[in-house]
Amino acid sequence: MFDTIISNGIIIDGTKKPRYQADIGIQNGNIKTVGDLSNSKAKNIINAENLIISPGFIDMHTHSDISLVNDKYGESKAYQGVTTEVTGNCSFSPFPAGKKGPNNLKKGLWETAALADDPNTNWTWNTLNDWANTIEKNGTSINIAPQLGYLSLIHI
């Protein structure tokens, strides 16, 4: 018995094979079987008839570095099929803060890059690890691949 079966979906798997219709059996958060599962049982069944199922997309150019701190669900990305974001683009990253602290970095990035900041975000991190721990503590539903923006280095 599966936890979830996604049934009747049109699968485009990124391998250059033609699209095909199949079911997907999920157990413990992992895909276990792809094929005809019409005789299988599951706790949850999602009917994906006439819907496309594909692997998650990687968004290589994002500016979600700050919004990820507050947006634990990443809904704007998840609804588009994005499962991984690359941050730190266009020379901006919210770390390292250096000896002058995160508020100096925040101010410098605002003045230099016209950074749109959520006023509810309290920049308490100084390093990549601090930033990543803040996001992990708050929770997130997507994977993050951070880059160090060189503009941040100017302000430390």
Task: Go through the PLM ranges and name each one.
Residues 1-5, 10-56, 71:
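Histidine-rich, glycine-flanked metal-binding segment
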Residues 4, 15, 62, 83-84, ...:
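Ser/Thr-centric signal marking residues that sit
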Residues 27, 63, 88:
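Acidic/polar N-terminal loop/beta-strand segments that form early-domain functional surfaces
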Residues 29, 155-156:
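Adenylate-forming
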Residues 38, 66, 93:
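Glycine-rich nucleotide phosphate-binding loop and flanking beta-alpha elements
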Residues 40-41, 63-64, 148:
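Residue-level signal for pocket-adjacent positions within structured domains
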Residues 53-76:
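Di-metal (Zn2+ and/or Mg2+/Mn2+) metal-binding site signature of metallo-dependent hydrolases
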Residues 70-154:
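Divalent-metal coordination cores built from histidine and acidic residues
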